[in-house]
């Protein structure tokens, strides 16, 4: 998605060899107009997939997932990283490792929110090692829901997450694919949605 790549060039900051800071529009401050366009793009890509729910994980996946759900006219559900007192139903639970935070979290969704046979589009902010996405896939398997696709806002193609998801037979759409960081700059690989630009 050229609009997203341009924004990464303008406001993204490369930290070291494997971190991209995008807190000016995605991971801290949210540019709702850009998120709306991202949501529309995911809805275009998955328009014929019969999506009944959009699922993400808190926190930075919420904005793009919400706009994708709005464009698809379906509910959006986010997996919580901490159980609160109101979550007293049966829970779908798994553990996910965060590459950026370097920690493992237990994530959960109420089993009442995902029904057997739901067709789920999983959206997340970043794809690095694939652990968050695979964790959400595992939650959907527990619910006997079908994952019809995974939409990643930004993918670090130099890490193994993409291959892990493709090896599981998943349909994957990444709107910005980073081939590498070079001299503090982002070098992009062709995005999965290039036919829509």
From Swiss-Prot:
<dbReference type="GO" id="GO:0032265">
    <property type="term" value="P:XMP salvage"/>
</dbReference>
<keyword id="KW-0808">Transferase</keyword>
<keyword id="KW-0963">Cytoplasm</keyword>
<dbReference type="GO" id="GO:0046110">
    <property type="term" value="P:xanthine metabolic process"/>
</dbReference>
<comment type="function">
    <text>Converts the preformed base xanthine, a product of nucleic acid breakdown, to xanthosine 5'-monophosphate (XMP), so it can be reused for RNA or DNA synthesis.</text>
</comment>
<feature type="binding site">
    <location>
        <position position="156"/>
    </location>
    <ligand>
        <name>xanthine</name>
    </ligand>
</feature>
<dbReference type="GO" id="GO:0006166">
    <property type="term" value="P:purine ribonucleoside salvage"/>
</dbReference>
<feature type="binding site">
    <location>
        <begin position="128"/>
        <end position="132"/>
    </location>
    <ligand>
        <name>5-phospho-alpha-D-ribose 1-diphosphate</name>
    </ligand>
</feature>
<dbReference type="Pfam" id="PF00156">
    <property type="entry name" value="Pribosyltran"/>
</dbReference>
<dbReference type="InterPro" id="IPR010079">
    <property type="entry name" value="Xanthine_PRibTrfase"/>
</dbReference>
<dbReference type="InterPro" id="IPR050118">
    <property type="entry name" value="Pur/Pyrimidine_PRTase"/>
</dbReference>
<keyword id="KW-0328">Glycosyltransferase</keyword>
<protein>
    <recommendedName>
        <fullName>Xanthine phosphoribosyltransferase</fullName>
        <ecNumber>2.4.2.22</ecNumber>
    </recommendedName>
</protein>
<comment type="pathway">
    <text>Purine metabolism; XMP biosynthesis via salvage pathway; XMP from xanthine: step 1/1.</text>
</comment>
<feature type="binding site">
    <location>
        <position position="27"/>
    </location>
    <ligand>
        <name>xanthine</name>
    </ligand>
</feature>
<comment type="subunit">
    <text>Homodimer.</text>
</comment>
<dbReference type="GO" id="GO:0005737">
    <property type="term" value="C:cytoplasm"/>
</dbReference>
<feature type="binding site">
    <location>
        <position position="20"/>
    </location>
    <ligand>
        <name>xanthine</name>
    </ligand>
</feature>
<dbReference type="InterPro" id="IPR029057">
    <property type="entry name" value="PRTase-like"/>
</dbReference>
<dbReference type="InterPro" id="IPR000836">
    <property type="entry name" value="PRibTrfase_dom"/>
</dbReference>
<keyword id="KW-0660">Purine salvage</keyword>
<dbReference type="GO" id="GO:0000310">
    <property type="term" value="F:xanthine phosphoribosyltransferase activity"/>
</dbReference>
<comment type="similarity">
    <text>Belongs to the purine/pyrimidine phosphoribosyltransferase family. Xpt subfamily.</text>
</comment>
